[in-house]
């Protein structure tokens, strides 16, 4: 009887472990969600677009089976633990002074 009980416990643990899915943050909307079967990596992809100087880099978060390949202007980081791809925490770019205020600040 003890052997049967032990066997059931082992089978349950093995089955639960096989059904595990990675959780990663995803964009649009920004929230943690389970990844599809076979996608065991979380990634963060950043790049500059036409709004980069005002808003900072564009960000894409998601799941992948392999770390995504990058284009020359992109940066990608991959990780393999749950929710390891949080939204990057960087400072928003500050606008440069322009016009009359700029000339007053440049020449005290």
Swiss-Prot record:
SUPFAM superfamilies xrefs: Snake toxin-like (SSF57302)
Superkingdom assignment: Eukaryota
GO molecular function: acetylcholine receptor inhibitor activity; ion channel regulator activity; toxin activity
Annotated localization: Secreted
Entry GO terms, CC: extracellular region
Tissue note: Expressed by the venom gland.
Segment forming the signal sequence: 1-21
Disulfide bond annotation, renumbered to this chain: 24-42, 35-63, 48-52, 67-78, 79-84
Pfam families: Toxin_cobra-type
InterPro entries: Snake_3FTx, Snake_toxin-like_sf, Snake_toxin_con_site, Toxin_cobra-type
Protein task: Binds with high affinity to muscular (alpha-1/CHRNA1) and neuronal (alpha-7/CHRNA7) nicotinic acetylcholine receptor (nAChR) and inhibits acetylcholine from binding to the receptor, thereby impairing neuromuscular and neuronal transmission.
Family designation: Belongs to the three-finger toxin family. Long-chain subfamily. Type II alpha-neurotoxin sub-subfamily.
Official protein name in the record: Long neurotoxin 13
